[in-house]
UniProtKB/Swiss-Prot annotation:
Identification of the protein by name: Transmembrane emp24 domain-containing protein 6
GO cellular component annotations of the record: COPII-coated ER to Golgi transport vesicle; endoplasmic reticulum; endoplasmic reticulum membrane; endoplasmic reticulum-Golgi intermediate compartment; Golgi apparatus
Family: Belongs to the EMP24/GP25L family.
Membrane-topology annotation of the record: Single-pass type I membrane protein
Main location: endoplasmic reticulum
Taxonomic lineage: Eukaryota, Metazoa, Chordata, Craniata, Vertebrata
Organism: Homo sapiens
GO process terms (BP): endoplasmic reticulum to Golgi vesicle-mediated transport; Golgi organization; intracellular protein transport
Sequence ranges assigned to domain GOLD in this UniProt record: 53-138
Cytoplasmic face of the membrane: 224-240
Residue ranges that the UniProt entry lists as topological domain Lumenal: 22-200
Glycosylation sites recorded in the entry for this protein: N107, N156
Keywords: Endoplasmic reticulum, Glycoprotein, Membrane, Signal, Transmembrane, Transmembrane helix
Spans traversing the lipid bilayer: 201-223
Gene it is expressed from: TMED6
Key word Transmembrane helix present: yes
Amino acid sequence: MSPLLFGAGLVVLNLVTSARSQKTEPLSGSGDQPLFRGADRYDFAIMIPPGGTECFWQFAHQTGYFYFSYEVQRTVGMSHDRHVAATAHNPQGFLIDTSQGVRGQINFSTQETGFYQLCLSNQHNHFGSVQVYLNFGVFYEGPETDHKQKERKQLNDTLDAIEDGTQKVQNNIFHMWRYYNFARMRKMADFFLIQSNYNYVNWWSTAQSLVIILSGILQLYFLKRLFNVPTTTDTKKPRC
């Protein structure tokens, strides 16, 4: 019974290992069908703990344009260092580019198909967390496969002009969307900065008010003791 169980366990282990080792990138069904090219875009905010690192993987096809931008919105904790380090690696694990600062960008052309790694490190801040706003994705300028080029030859001049105009409008909309995200990142960073300054001014004003009131009470107490004249009686008289 035990040899059968051991053999079944090996079979299950092999199946799990083979399933985990498979690539999850899209595959084309046949040679006539073009490879799917999706323009995935992401924008969200994450909280990185003190000294921590957060990584993301984005799938991209060859001959694409990869963009990645970030901005530190606020800090939480004892330290207020807002600098972070960003890195981008290709599917083979080789470093493509780095960026350090409160905000930055990493843009490059994808030379191979696979998952590209993006990492953000809070290594400069060991006593506080940072909230970082991210905006990254892949954009493809237009059809570049042989299948699309053959289809373009079959279109007349009018449809070709309409397609070119539509592609230009799509590119302009995409770049305007990126500028809009830059404005959102800057707006949120300014909002958190104003809120932090507002809280700082309120706490500092309250502390100064308490110090002024306490110092007034102490001054009144010492002045009262200074002018306090002891009463004289028959049994208790001041000495010469």
